[in-house]
C-alpha cells in the first residue's frame, strides 16, 4: 500500500507502550513509515538523525511534556514547519481549553 501523500515518516512520542505500538502498527499498515518513542530523549536523538514529515505528541510524558517538545520543534528552523498533532488522555473541560 502506498504511503499517505506527503507523510513518508511520522514520529510518535507516547510513554504508554501499548498505545504507541498499536498506533505505529496502524500507520505502517497504511504504508506510512513510522517510529515510536517513549521519551523525549529518544525522540530528540531521532530528530537529529532524520526530520520527520509529521509528529504525534502525547501531552503527558515522564521526562517532559508534549507542549515543551512542541515549543522546541517550533523554535528550530529545521522542524518549525513540521505538522504536529497533540494527543492526550486528559479530558476535563479546563484541559480541553488549554
Question: Model-predicted segments: where are they?
Answer:
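Non-catalytic signal-transmission and effector/linker regions of two-component phosphorelay proteins
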Residues: 1-11
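Acidic, metal-coordinating helix/loop segments flanking the phosphotransfer/catalytic sites
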Residues: 36-54
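His-Asp phosphorelay/catalytic-motif detector in bacterial-type signaling
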Residues: 51-53, 78-83
Amino acid at each position: 500500500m502506498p504511503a499517505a501523500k506527503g507523510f513518508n515518516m511520522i514520529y510518535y512520542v507516547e510513554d504508554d507502550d501499548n498505545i504507541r505500538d498499536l498506533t505505529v502498527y496502524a500507520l505502517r499498515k497504511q504504508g506510512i513509515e513510522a517510529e515510536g518513542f517513549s521519551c523525549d530523549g529518544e525522540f530528540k536523538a531521532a530528530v537529529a538523525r532524520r526530520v520527520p514529515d509529521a509528529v504525534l505528541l502525547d501531552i503527558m510524558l515522564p521526562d517532559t511534556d508534549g507542549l515543551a517538545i512542541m515549543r522546541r520543534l517550533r523554535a528550530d528552523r529545521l522542524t518549525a514547519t513540521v505538522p504536529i498533532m497533540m494527543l492526550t488522555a486528559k479530558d476535563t473541560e479546563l484541559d480541553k481549553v488549554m
